[in-house]
């Protein structure tokens, strides 16, 4: 078993100002997105559409607003609506954590629609350009989760080579042990807990980095290197992210204030299913429609 390094959540101290790893990873994610966007400008069919470095900079401005506002509001509405309706001022305490990818996705979608309207471009032209830029940012965000030792995975066998002990999960581990003595006996977890005061869990943040970040990036990057029907790249992102998130959720610990919902699925899985369905329908529509994005 591997013990989580238990990093200091503060990366840099600047006098009274503390720069946290999670916020730093958001910055890294946006930088990666800009780099990927500029690399895409070198593709002939992308350059022919009239995209420029200034467009990328403007997109990132809209994207930051969409991620922060949408991610926070999504977390408030999808995960802890009851709490925040009772404590509305806590909605603004973003530094304490609490962001939702699906909310951020909706926020960015609306932000890109506004960008497209201002630039007189079709909305799907914009999302097709942006889609391959997103996974590297997702990977950076999940790395921030791992550094913080949060959003850990479900309990697993101590014999699994990837099993990890998360100090922050010790209280949850004790509650899990009391409720699952049948599995604990099968995996000798009582002995593990007596020795470490923790239980082995899946490092699900790393799974998400691998699937939602690295794998999805390469799939989108190679798919988008050739001209595709308008909407196809966006559709592949919806399918790829939705499928990756749905899969990883089987190893990720459900939110304690929600648990598992209908059919034993988590909130993340229920929010991912519409993405997959929408992506499949959009892909069919894109190829039936035919053609590629217009040139400038």
Swiss-Prot record:
Pathway: Protein modification; lipoprotein biosynthesis (diacylglyceryl transfer). A 1,2-diacyl-sn-glycero-3-phospho-(1'-sn-glycerol) binds at residue 142. One of its GO terms (cellular component) is plasma membrane. It is an enzyme of class 2 (transferase). It holds the Pfam family LGT. It is found in: Cell inner membrane. It comes from the Bacteria. One of its GO terms (molecular function) is phosphatidylglycerol-prolipoprotein diacylglyceryl transferase activity. Its EC number is 2.5.1.145. Catalyzes the transfer of the diacylglyceryl group from phosphatidylglycerol to the sulfhydryl group of the N-terminal cysteine of a prolipoprotein, the first step in the formation of mature lipoproteins. This is Phosphatidylglycerol--prolipoprotein diacylglyceryl transferase. It comes from Burkholderia pseudomallei (strain 668). The lineage of its organism: Bacteria, Pseudomonadati, Pseudomonadota, Betaproteobacteria, Burkholderiales.
